[in-house]
């Protein structure tokens, strides 16, 4: 069985849509960035840390998603004012979303990531406040969800599921590890 080390409902939905046999066991870790840590170094460190306790008999997968603008990481907002600040910063601009994938199986640890460009509408403070009140994006990096109707995303380039928080194109590259966990597969 696959063990998904994540609390994200979006990651759960994506794995369910792939018809995989998995269970959720999230690991709580300190997601603080280190001083002068490059965004991709941070992504790798956090994605692999989320793998948590290793089990040689199970396939463990973990993910982390970061929003990066001007080489600065925008994590999940801690409160309403921080969400406003992030969305004002992203308004009318383009940023990059990186999602990292940590995999542990048979004593081997691997990391891969994908990136997507996201273009935002130009929003005023009232539009931003209404969005936050309606969607409560406090569990999302950058304070937004690409899937939110009437959200701030104007367009994007790259993988939709990557922006949701699961780098599916990278996951597919490891199909030899996970194909036996397809429901109904006796391989």
Swiss-Prot record:
Transmembrane segments: none annotated. InterPro entries: ITPase-like_fam (IPR029001), Maf-like (IPR003697). It is found in: Cytoplasm. GO terms for molecular function: dTTP diphosphatase activity; nucleoside triphosphate diphosphatase activity; UTP diphosphatase activity. GO terms for biological process: nucleotide metabolic process. The active site is at 64 (proton acceptor). It catalyses: dTTP + H2O = dTMP + diphosphate + H(+); UTP + H2O = UMP + diphosphate + H(+). Keywords: Cytoplasm, Hydrolase, Nucleotide metabolism. The keyword Cytoplasm applies. Belongs to the Maf family. YhdE subfamily. PANTHER family: BIFUNCTIONAL DTTP/UTP PYROPHOSPHATASE/METHYLTRANSFERASE PROTEIN-RELATED, BIFUNCTIONAL DTTP_UTP PYROPHOSPHATASE_METHYLTRANSFERASE PROTEIN-RELATED. Nucleoside triphosphate pyrophosphatase that hydrolyzes dTTP and UTP. May have a dual role in cell division arrest and in preventing the incorporation of modified nucleotides into cellular nucleic acids. This is dTTP/UTP pyrophosphatase. It comes from Leptospira interrogans serogroup Icterohaemorrhagiae serovar Lai (strain 56601).
């Amino acid at each position: 069985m696959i063990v998904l080390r994540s609390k994200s409902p979006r990651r759960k939905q994506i794995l369910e849509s792939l018809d995989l046999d998995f269970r959720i066991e999230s690991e709580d870790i300190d997601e603080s960035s280190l001083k002068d840590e490059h965004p991709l170094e941070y992504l790798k460190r956090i994605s692999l840390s989320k793998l948590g306790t290793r089990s040689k008999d199970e396939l463990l997968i973990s993910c982390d998603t970061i929003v990066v603008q001007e080489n600065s990481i925008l994590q999940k907002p801690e409160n309403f004012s921080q969400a406003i600040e992030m969305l004002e910063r992203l308004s009318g601009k383009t940023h990059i979303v990186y999602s990292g994938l940590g995999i542990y199986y048979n004593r081997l640890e691997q990391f891969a990531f994908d990136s997507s460009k996201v273009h935002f509408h130009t929003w005023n403070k009232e539009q931003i406040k209404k969005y936050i009140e309606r969607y409560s994006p406090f569990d999302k990096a950058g304070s937004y969800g690409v899937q939110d109707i009437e959200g701030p995303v104007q367009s994007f380039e790259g993988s939709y599921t990557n922006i949701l928080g699961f780098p599916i194109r990278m996951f597919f590259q490891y199909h030899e590890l996970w194909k036996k966990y397809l429901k109904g597969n006796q391989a």
